[in-house]
Amino acid sequence: MVLAHSINTNPNTNTNTNNTSTTSSTTTIPNDSKILCINFNQDQGCFAISHEQGFLVYNTDPIELRVKRNFIVNSHTTSSRSNHSNGSNSNNNHRNNSTGSNGSVSSSGSNNETTLGYKSTHKSASGSGSGSGSGIGHISMLHRTNYLALIGGGENPKFPINKLIIWDDLKRKTSLSLEFDTPVLNVLLSRVRIIVVLIDQIIVYGFAAPPKKFQTFNTINNPLGIADLSVNSQQSNVHLYNNYSSNSAQAQVSGTTTTTHYDFSKRKSLSPTNSSNSSSTSLKENGTNLTTYPSPSSTTSASASVATITNTPEAATTANPTTATTTATTTATTTTTTTSAKPLVNGIGSSYQTLAFPGRSMGQIQIVDVGNNHHSGTNIKPTINIIKAHKSNIRCLCLNRTGTLIASASITGTIIRIHSTRTTALLYEFRRGIDRAIITSMKFSHDDSKLAVLSDKHTLHVYNIDETQYPNDGGSGGTKDGGGGGRGSKNRHHLLNGLLPYLPNYFQSTWSFCSVNTNKYHTSDLEDNSQQQQQQWVANGTGGGGVDEGVIGWSGNDSIIIIWKLKKIWEKYVIVETENHQYDLIRSSWKRLDS
């Protein structure tokens, strides 16, 4: 039995259901600390925030602080997560969590440390790269485990901006590190892969010690680090937390926290058993390295915190790969350009995992299978599909959980397109508006029935996806406008659509079935806050309806969570049906994340 992290929570912290905000010291970000990155985990049940002083991990809904790490040197409180197993060694871990300015690939999962040197021309922005700073510019979670990907950032970076840190939060120290010649812009994690996004490259590593480089893909200039990774579809690799019980949720008694024990002794490796060199190079857990951030609900089981994959729509393709190949080739000829006649296969027995990123040309999206069956140790080469999605550069893209659908928007921000990753066929084309906008976030709902889109105009759109129009994903049943009956008919169309022939494309567009301008709520939020917070919001450009970047996550299939960087607030919007059988987005609750 291993003593896992237990998290201090405040049972009196309530989410707001109106325009009155309450603050709690256990859920706050310092006023003087700028949020640098917000990312949800793979099932969107948690989200992580990195800022100028460290990082935090929250449960998504209900919002609840799970982890708080403060990297400020000589700070009175370096963390606010109760972990008695580390004891007095926690401060030493904070002082020694950097691998040094020379760069390295290291593993700290066992007593035998493996180190591999890398040369780099970059040093830490804070000086020698010894970790004397505190800013975390990027954070990515690996489901609910204790492994997080960190990159230094902000005015005083904790780590060099060209260095990827795999942080073991159970030991509060660096587990792996990778250093590059250019800044690391984004990191995507799965249980078998580490995806590193550079300015013009995507590098795929195995999640092992030391990490093994599998593939490198060149891209168009990608300063925003745009990329997305689906959840690994191999069922045998999904259940990391098979020993998690309903009793593992922590209990609060008389203001004290009861610690929780987890048994991970049955788990030996983060890599699956069929992974190359898994016996010698995997990150060994040894019963001590892996823990989870449990859901606050005491009735939540292990399967609730693990993304489960269903492959029902793909059954026809898997059963008859020859037919599927022919269909994919024909479709790609008329709609897109593809580098392979073989479609991406997402069978139940495969280890399929979709990686999507901008291609080498403007408006192109490259789709690659980076699953565990594709690595340099075998003769199996990854299937690569190219989708010509837009005429302008890609600004935002997202995959559904199974990696069968990809939604994308260009820098114009007026049109949202959904393609099949297997056949590259265009399935839907939605219109956001007629004026330019920056799409800041997009997410599919958990059941792939809806797509939520958020822009810099603070408008949240939700589009309905009619799955009955592409049951076999072969292209023949697809549609370019998202209409035609079923659930897709909820989306709005222009009144003249279908009445007159040869209408311009604008009149044939499909619009979201519900939307909301979040500014109408933010204006009242500003009025209810203190004068000091009002001045801060105005200084950040948010008080007068200025630009703020929100990040979307789904809570269920009818509730959308938005986390705002500058305003530092959490919001929950719910899709409700009105009396006239229309749909609307209502803000049901919100909470400030700053003090």
Swiss-Prot record:
Gene3D superfamilies: YVTN repeat-like/Quinoprotein amine dehydrogenase. GO terms for cellular component: cytoplasmic vesicle membrane; cytosol; phagophore assembly site membrane; vacuolar membrane. The gene is HSV2. Belongs to the WD repeat PROPPIN family. WD repeats lie at residues 30-68, 389-429, 434-473. It is found in: Vacuole membrane; Cytoplasmic vesicle membrane. It comes from the Eukaryota. May contain a beta-propeller domain involved in specific binding to phosphatidylinositol 3,5-bisphosphate (PIP2), leading to the association of the protein to the membrane. This is SVP1-like protein 2. It is a peripheral membrane protein. GO terms for biological process: autophagy of mitochondrion; glycophagy; nucleophagy; pexophagy; protein localization to phagophore assembly site; protein transport. Residues 1-28, 76-132, 264-342, 467-490 are annotated as: Disordered. One of its GO terms (molecular function) is protein-macromolecule adaptor activity. Its main location: membrane. InterPro entries: PROPPIN, WD40/YVTN_repeat-like_dom_sf, WD40_repeat_dom_sf, WD40_rpt. Signal peptide: none annotated. Keywords: Cytoplasmic vesicle, Membrane, Protein transport, Repeat, Transport, Vacuole, WD repeat. Residues 474-488 have a biased composition (Gly residues). Pfam families: PROPPIN. Residues 76-112, 270-339 have a biased composition (Low complexity). Involved in mitochondrial or peroxisomal functions and amino acid signaling pathways.
